Regions:
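Short beta->alpha transition motifs characteristic of CBS
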Residues: 114-117, 134-139
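N-terminal beta-strand motif that seeds the catalytic metal site of vicinal oxygen chelate
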Residues: 1-18, 75-79, 137-139
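Conserved catalytic-core motifs of GNAT/GCN5-like acyltransferases
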Residues: 31-37, 101-103, 135
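Core segments of cupin and vicinal oxygen chelate
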Residues: 13-54
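Helix-adjacent hinge/juxtasegments
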Residues: 57, 63-81
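Vicinal oxygen chelate
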Residues: 15-18, 77-127
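Exposed loop/turn and edge beta-strand positions of beta-sandwich/beta-sheet ligand-binding modules
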Residues: 39, 73, 117
Length: 139
């Protein structure tokens, strides 16, 4: 079988669901969507305007990045966005800054001239999960 579809969802582990709800809903402005009545707590958020989702559960051990800095070579997920400049400006309004140490939860790691050919911005969520904004252009 060949997989010819697209990514359906990403699952990350967190310590505090309500803190994560506030971050993904209020800071990143993702839409929370209903999830089935599993026997464990969690959250689902829509990624973009399609049926791709971010699934969040309380995780333990290896799922957690406790004490680890913003490092694009570590496990992360990437969100495709149109503009580097607009995304950077938007993240600044949310309190993120590039002059903070890499282990600060509001640090921005910027790669406007990434070797990948796509400008990149990296941030941390409250549980130190790394989020990449993979930009279509610099403008």
């Amino acid at each position: 079988m060949t997989i010819k579809s697209r990514l359906h969802h990403i699952l990350i582990g967190v310590d505090d669901l309500e803190r994560s709800r506030a971050f993904y809903r209020d800071v990143l402005e993702m839409q929370e969507v209903d999830r089935p009545p599993f026997k464990f707590a969690g959250l689902w958020f829509r990624i973009g305007d399609n049926d791709q989702h971010l699934h969040i559960i309380v995780g333990e051990g290896a799922m957690q990045r406790t004490g680890r800095p913003n490092n694009p070579q570590d496990v992360h997920f990437a969100l495709r966005v149109p503009s580097y400049r607009e995304t950077l400006d938007w993240l600044h309004t949310k309190g993120f800054r590039e002059d903070l140490p890499a282990d600060d939860l509001r640090s921005l790691m910027l790669r406007p001239n990434s070797i990948t050919g796509h400008p990149q911005i990296y941030i941390l969520d409250p549980d130190r999960n790394i989020i990449e904004f993979n930009c279509e252009s610099l403008d």
